[in-house]
Each structure stands twice: as structure tokens, then as C-alpha cells.
A protein has these predicted regions:
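Flexible, solvent-exposed loop/hinge segments and secondary-structure transition points
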Residues: 1-247
Length: 247
């Protein structure tokens, strides 16, 4: 009897796995797209179609080198990298996926072309909130400085307080903010303590009442990952300037 139920359970898992994998794919691509466009009216199949048409990706190592296969010779797929598991590794041992969005079609641009063809760069991030993990996709415009949009998520932040990071109200505050200052130094974006702050500069967003620790977690997460991605960003910002100056 035990063997029978064990076999039945195994078969059930095998049957459900493709469904679960498809749901994970939809959820991942939904979050990535959600950082750059409004996806509220898109059903799952439209999300997949839009993603496949308008997005390409690349995976880097800590030295900003493109990596395409792992140590076992298997292809590395950006969308399949588990950012949570990746986060547990030392920064120099992680993989860093980057997603590039084109408002026309992914067939019309190459991964290594910048400025003229890539509308937005999306960077996945992971960190800690008050109670559990927080994560996000932060999109930069083609200047690789201005925030196009963000899509934050969390596991267990306090409802009505830290959990607000996943709301449009909070996420919209990040739009048009700058991560570099006029000297080209990485400043990142800081969520201020408290809400309804009167003085907010281009590197700051208004805070959330009663959620200082969650806000601090966001600040640390964003700064840490942009520090890791900074080599790639600086290189592609330079390429973008060169391409623009030639036109």
C-alpha cells in the first residue's frame, strides 16, 4: 500500500510539474514586464507573447563578463535564475541577469547595441525586509540613470505598512528618480523615514509611515545591486554616449 501511494504521489508530481513551471514562467515575466509597462489588462498568454516579442536578456558574472553555460555545460537562461538562491551566494559567485526591453520588437535589436535600440534595462534584486525577504525589478531608461519603473514584492511585510512596497502608490514614487549624480557617482535611491516629507531630491522618495525597517531594506537592496551592476552600467552608458555623438 505504501509503495502504491508513493508511486501515485510521484506520478501526480510529474503531471503537475509542467503546470507549475508554466506558472513560475508567467509570474517571473509578469514581474519583469511590470517594471516597464502597465500589464493590468494583459492575461497570462498576452504577458508571455508581449515578453517574447519585446524582451531579450543577458547573464553576467561579477566581473561583468557574459556567461552562457554553467560548469556542467548547461545553457544559462536569465529568466530561470533563482534570485533568492543566488542572493545566498557571495556577490562574486553570483550570476547577474539583465533584461532589455524594446517598445517595438526584440527582432529589431541586438543584445549589445545600446541607446538607439534598448528602451529600458531591468535589473533583478533581492534583500531583507522587516520579517522576511523582499525583492524587486528596477528598470532604468536608456540613459542608464533615470528610473523607468519598479516592481517590488515581499513575502511577509506588515499589511498596511511595509507591505505597501508592492502597491502602485509606493512604486510610482520611484519613477524619474536618478541613481547617479551630476559627477557620475552612484548615489542610488533612498526612501526617507516617515511620510509626507517636504524636501525630497532626485535621489530620494517619500517614505512609508510605520515601515522604516522595510524602507531601509529597500534602500540597502537597491544600492547593493546597483553597486554589483555598476561596471556593466558604466560601460554601456559610455557606449550610448559614443553612439549618440556619431549621429
Amino acid at each position: 500500500m505504501t509503495v502504491f501511494f508513493g508511486t501515485l504521489l510521484s506520478l501526480t508530481r510529474m503531471k503537475l510539474k509542467p503546470i507549475q513551471d508554466k506558472q513560475i514562467e508567467i509570474d517571473t515575466k509578469k514581474k519583469i514586464l511590470g517594471a516597464v509597462i502597465d500589464i493590468s489588462d494583459l492575461d497570462p498568454e498576452q504577458i508571455l507573447a508581449t515578453y517574447n516579442e519585446k524582451m531579450v536578456s543577458v547573464v553576467l558574472n561579477y566581473d561583468n563578463e557574459v556567461v552562457e553555460i554553467d560548469s556542467k555545460g548547461n545553457a544559462i537562461v536569465a529568466e530561470e535564475i533563482n534570485i533568492q538562491k543566488n542572493y545566498k551566494l557571495k556577490p562574486e559567485d553570483r550570476l547577474y541577469p539583465i533584461f532589455m526591453y524594446n517598445s517595438n520588437s526584440s527582432d529589431e535589436f541586438e543584445i549589445y547595441q545600446t541607446m538607439k535600440t534598448v528602451d529600458s534595462y531591468i535589473f533583478p534584486m533581492f534583500g531583507n525586509g522587516l520579517w522576511e525577504w523582499i525583492s524587486g525589478y528596477v528598470a532604468l531608461e536608456k540613459d542608464l540613470n533615470t528610473i523607468k519603473g519598479v516592481a517590488f514584492d515581499h513575502k511577509q511585510e506588515t499589511p498596511g505598512l511595509g507591505a505597501r512596497i508592492s502597491s502602485n502608490e509606493i512604486q510610482d514614487r520611484y519613477k524619474k528618480k536618478k541613481i547617479f549624480d551630476n559627477n557620475g557617482d552612484l548615489i542610488s535611491i533612498t526612501m526617507l523615514k516617515g511620510e509626507n516629507n517636504r524636501t525630497i531630491n532626485e535621489h530620494q522618495v517619500d517614505g512609508m509611515s510605520g515601515a522604516t525597517i522595510t524602507g531601509n531594506g529597500l534602500n540597502k537592496m537597491i544600492l547593493h545591486y546597483f553597486e554589483c551592476y555598476q561596471g556593466y552600467i558604466n560601460k554601456n552608458k559610455l557606449n550610448a554616449v559614443i553612439k549618440t555623438s556619431k549621429n
